[in-house]
């Protein structure tokens, strides 16, 4: 199964990964697309959904591997503040904070050099986030697809098949996501398909059970 890269991916993305019986890969050959889950994620707040974006540098037609993260607008501090405000009272925010907060600190060149992934690049930043989240949830993390590999598996891009070998989640045709506890559910109702952080901060170790109990994305 071939997935597009995603920043703190939505629950539906992890639902497919948790239920997948085959090897999962992250596509490294696609061109970057603006205003997608590649560099943005949505959280549930007291006033409703809030989308957080990571600013990037590079042409809109550039390969995803070449997209650099920008330091514009001090986004790291703003994102962490938004998460702390939205989920500070959730059951498992403090439990996972030490695992998640480091992703909102800029690495030094030496730290990047000593790490498996260089956080100056969006794809590598996303990959370390995904591996960390998979380890927390208890599922096998996908691998980066080598550039020279032929596409022999379906591409899951976020649930209707829109092109040969591609399955796209458009937010309308995907199978219904079963509600789970959310902090502001009494005010907003259940907000489906938020970032996986929403599920983790609210459900903790039971997140894997929620993911496996959801209707399969691909029958």
Language-model regions, residue ranges each:
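Residues lining hydrophobic/aromatic ligand-binding pockets adjacent to catalytic sites
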Residues: 1-219
């Amino acid at each position: 199964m071939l997935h597009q890269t995603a920043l703190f991916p939505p629950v539906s993305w992890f639902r497919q990964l948790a239920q997948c019986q085959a090897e999962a890969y992250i596509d490294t050959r696609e061109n970057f697309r603006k205003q997608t889950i590649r560099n943005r994620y949505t959280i549930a707040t007291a006033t409703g959904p809030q989308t957080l974006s990571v600013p990037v540098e590079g042409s809109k037609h550039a390969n995803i591997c070449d997209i650099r993260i920008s330091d514009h607008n001090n986004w790291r501090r703003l994102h962490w503040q938004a998460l702390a405000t939205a989920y500070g009272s959730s059951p498992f925010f403090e439990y996972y904070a030490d695992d998640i907060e480091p992703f909102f600190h800029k690495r030094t060149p030496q730290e990047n050099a000593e790490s498996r992934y260089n956080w100056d690049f969006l794809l590598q930043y996303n990959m370390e986030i995904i591996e960390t989240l998979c380890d927390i949830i208890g599922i096998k993390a996908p691998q980066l697809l080598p550039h020279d590999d032929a596409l022999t598996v379906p591409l899951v891009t976020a649930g209707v098949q829109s092109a040969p070998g591609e399955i796209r989640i458009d937010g309308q045709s995907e199978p219904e996501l079963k509600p789970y506890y959310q902090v502001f559910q009494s005010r907003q109702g259940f907000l489906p398909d938020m970032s996986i952080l929403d599920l983790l901060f609210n459900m903790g170790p039971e997140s894997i059970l929620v993911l496996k109990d959801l209707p399969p994305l691909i029958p």
